[in-house]
A protein has these predicted regions:
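NAD(P)+-binding Rossmann beta1-loop-alpha1 motif at the extreme N-terminus of oxidoreductases
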Residues: 1-66, 91
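Rossmann-fold dinucleotide-binding core
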Residues: 4, 99-162
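A short acidic, helix-capping loop that chelates divalent metal ions and anchors anionic groups
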Residues: 37-38, 73, 128-132
Length: 162
């Protein structure tokens, strides 16, 4: 099983991350803005809390972001101590946030310059669907590499559209 890092364990991210753990993946998570109840929920399921992006990115193969807006995703990727500045860049970023397409294009181009692969995979439906693992996930990215993330996406969604 792949080692997963998850950034953003709020209303949608918490159940998505929970489903990943419940399907047997090793999951580490980081979210500086979340309440302790979400942290405790994931810890009780077997998730590992990380205290920085540096710590989160050390031993993961895939990092998922589920953040409120494009500025948050850009900050995680390119801000001070962002993902592009970490020692391990041998991961795939799956941004599942619903953000402006221009932000996604910019983020993808900048990550590519740093040899980091990215998929844009926003979700649709309700919080209950996130809890049930029945989200609609619309994926954009390298088609040949899509097969490497499809099983992971299926832990969170019942309808995966490439």
């Amino acid at each position: 099983m792949k080692k997963i890092g998850f950034i953003g364990i709020g209303t949608m991210g918490l159940p998505m991350a929970s489903n990943i753990i419940n399907k047997g993946y090793s999951l580490s998570f980081y979210d500086p803005f979340v309440n302790s109840d979400s942290v405790n929920t994931l810890k009780n399921l077997g998730g590992t809390e990380k205290t920085s992006l540096s710590e989160l990115s050390q031993n993961v193969e895939i990092i998922i972001t589920m953040l409120p807006n494009g500025d948050n995703v850009k900050e995680v990727c390119f801000g001070k101590n962002g993902l592009i500045y970490q020692d391990n860049k041998n991961f795939v970023l799956i941004d599942m946030s619903t953000i402006n397409p221009n932000d996604s294009i910019f983020i993808n181009e900048e990550l590519n310059k740093n040899n980091i692969k990215m998929f844009d995979a926003p979700v649709a439906r309700l919080v209950q669907n996130a809890i049930d693992g029945t989200l609609l996930i619309m994926v954009g990215g390298n088609k040949d590499e899509f097969k490497n993330i499809k099983n992971l996406l299926e832990t969170m969604g019942s309808d995966i559209v490439y």
